């Protein structure tokens, strides 16, 4: 649905803003943080996940308590960040209503597929694991825990088959070509 999400925020002003200093790039990605990414990769590979302790930072002063290392997107370069939903592709002057309709439709469509599978499953718990495994394998290319402003991300995203629809005409043509 990456092309539809981009179309949902298409405007001349947003074309100028996306990928600039104050906004994420026009590439749809999801920042999960290392901890959650490792958990999902473990499920997808069928391996046991070692729930390691959170990393603590050392700040070099004895009087300051240990500070847990933040595993969220500190640069806020991803439309979906950490343990919260923060859709940043939309410009501040725009209404999020169209984008919400599209997002909710995408989620509902996906949940309907999951529900159909679970309703007919003999072993629901095993089917949940299968759904997670298949979903992670099919969509892990959108997970990016790095700096979305770095030029290397644009090249990596292209290798992963992610769109970088920088302009409204690109977004509309990308959707038309995919339809």
Regions found by a protein language model. Give the residues of each.
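Acidic, glycine-enriched catalytic cores built around paired aspartates
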Residues: 1-179
């Amino acid at each position: 649905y990456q092309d539809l999400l981009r179309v949902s925020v298409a405007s001349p002003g947003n074309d100028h803003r996306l990928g600039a200093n104050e906004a994420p790039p026009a590439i749809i990605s999801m920042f999960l943080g290392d901890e959650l990414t490792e958990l999902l990769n473990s499920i997808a590979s069928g391996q046991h996940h070692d729930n390691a302790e959170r990393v603590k930072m050392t700040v070099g002063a004895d009087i300051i308590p240990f500070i847990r290392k933040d595993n969220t997107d500190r640069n806020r370069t991803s439309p979906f960040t950490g343990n919260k939903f923060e859709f940043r592709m939309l410009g501040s002057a725009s209404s999020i209503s169209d984008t919400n309709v599209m997002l909710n439709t995408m989620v509902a469509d996906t949940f309907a597929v999951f529900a159909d599978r679970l309703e007919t499953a003999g072993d629901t718990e095993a089917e949940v694991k299968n759904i997670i495994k298949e979903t992670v394998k099919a969509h892990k290319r959108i997970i990016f825990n790095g700096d979305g402003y770095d030029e290397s991300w644009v090249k990596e995203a292209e290798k992963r088959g992610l769109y970088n629809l920088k302009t409204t005409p690109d977004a509309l043509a990308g959707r038309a070509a995919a339809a």
